[in-house]
Amino acid sequence: MLFELIFIFLARVLDVSLGTVRMILVIRGDRIPAAIIGFFEILIYTVALGLVIGSLNEPLKLLVFCSGFALGILLGSILEEKIALGYRGVQVTIDSEHGHIVEELREEGFPVTCWEASGKAGSKLVLNIFLKRNMAVAVADKIYEKDPDAFVVFMEPKHFQGGYIKKK
């Protein structure tokens, strides 16, 4: 009985975590990996569900099944943050006086496109940076170190073509 409860719990944690990753892949347009993950996700889910459906007179199994689902959501979202698949666009607006930030980022290998803009408080620079998703927060932190008043917007591009992307 204990082994079965542990199995149900871990199966739910695993299948829901896989489901989170699968959904991210679908949104990004990675259909084949999403389909493969989906196969294993539903296989694991069906086995766990079968153990619970066959024992509806044992509420502990249902509680464990639901608890595994809840923890799977939490772990799936943490896993998704850690693997950080894909790319992110970062648009930054800074005061023109902080123009040195552009060259510093380029020296570090970041692909920065920059243009002048006019804001309520004067002349601004708008920086457009596309990079691997796991690097986006680090770039924003570098910018905030130099200009705490920077306005930073993160975007999730679904498709893009051409240009330069920092690889590491």
Curated annotation (Swiss-Prot):
Main localisation: membrane
HAMAP family attached to this UniProt entry: UPF0316
Subcellular location(s) of the protein: Cell membrane
Transmembrane intervals: 1-21, 34-54, 59-79
Keywords: Cell membrane, Membrane, Transmembrane, Transmembrane helix
InterPro entries the record matches: DUF2179 (IPR019264), DUF5698 (IPR044035), UPF0316 (IPR022930)
Domain of life of the native organism: Bacteria
Name of the protein: UPF0316 protein Swol_0526
Family that this chain belongs to: Belongs to the UPF0316 family.
GO cellular component, one term: plasma membrane
Membrane topology classification: Multi-pass membrane protein
